[in-house]
């Protein structure tokens, strides 16, 4: 039981550090999104490909918002 608590604490600390790095680098990722990205990388997803997908999704979101503002 103590081992599980220690492992959970280590994971939380690691995620806190990763989130701080993410914030310093101004990635715009929230803790939940960062956690999903970490899990995907742990499962073998290429981090560079994941980064490209995130950038493309952000561009598409911005384009949709711009289109809504023009028609809305």
Curated annotation (Swiss-Prot):
It is found in: Cytoplasm, Cytoskeleton, Microtubule organizing center, Centrosome; Cytoplasm, Cytoskeleton, Spindle. One of its GO terms (biological process) is microtubule nucleation by interphase microtubule organizing center. It holds the Pfam family MOZART1. It comes from the Eukaryota. Disulfide bonds: none annotated. Keywords: Cytoplasm, Cytoskeleton. GO terms for cellular component: centrosome; cytoplasm; gamma-tubulin ring complex; interphase microtubule organizing center; spindle. Part of the gamma-tubulin complex. Required for gamma-tubulin complex recruitment to the centrosome. Belongs to the MOZART1 family. This is Mitotic-spindle organizing protein 1.
């Amino acid at each position: 039981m103590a081992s599980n608590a220690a492992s959970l604490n280590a994971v939380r600390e690691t995620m806190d550090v990763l989130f701080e790095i993410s914030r310093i680098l101004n990635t715009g990722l929230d803790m939940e999104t960062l956690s999903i990205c970490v899990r995907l990388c742990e499962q073998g997803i290429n981090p560079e490909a994941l980064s490209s997908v995130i950038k493309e999704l952000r561009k598409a979101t911005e384009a949709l918002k711009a289109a809504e503002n023009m028609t809305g």
